[in-house]
């Protein structure tokens, strides 16, 4: 099962990137990679998606364009959008 605290901890190093752009740190990309590893099943993906969405909603300064580019910038094939508006049931 996915624990949102774990997802939050994975994303915390990404906050400066998500709010300011630039290049994500190694710690941030490691976190993105760990979320991908956690989300092994379709249900885990939905749960992780809801955690990511909730985390994104706690930071109103997150730039959606930057957030959506995060997996690409980290070279991680993440099937979970980093967004405040994702419909996680559609994943």
From Swiss-Prot:
It comes from Foeniculum vulgare (Fennel). PANTHER family: NON-SPECIFIC LIPID-TRANSFER PROTEIN 2-RELATED (PTHR33076). Belongs to the plant LTP family. Signal peptide: none annotated. Expressed in seeds (at protein level). GO terms for molecular function: lipid binding. Plant non-specific lipid-transfer proteins transfer phospholipids as well as galactolipids across membranes. May play a role in wax or cutin deposition in the cell walls of expanding epidermal cells and certain secretory tissues. Binds to both saturated and unsaturated lipids, with the highest binding efficiency for linoleic acid, followed by linolenic acid. InterPro entries: Bifun_inhib/LTP/seed_sf, Bifunc_inhib/LTP/seed_store, Plant_nsLTP. The keyword Membrane does not apply. One of its GO terms (biological process) is lipid transport. Pfam families: Tryp_alpha_amyl (PF00234). Disulfide bonds join 4-51, 14-28, 29-74, 49-88. CDD domains: nsLTP1. This is Non-specific lipid-transfer protein 1. Keywords: Disulfide bond, Lipid-binding, Transport. The keyword Disulfide bond applies.
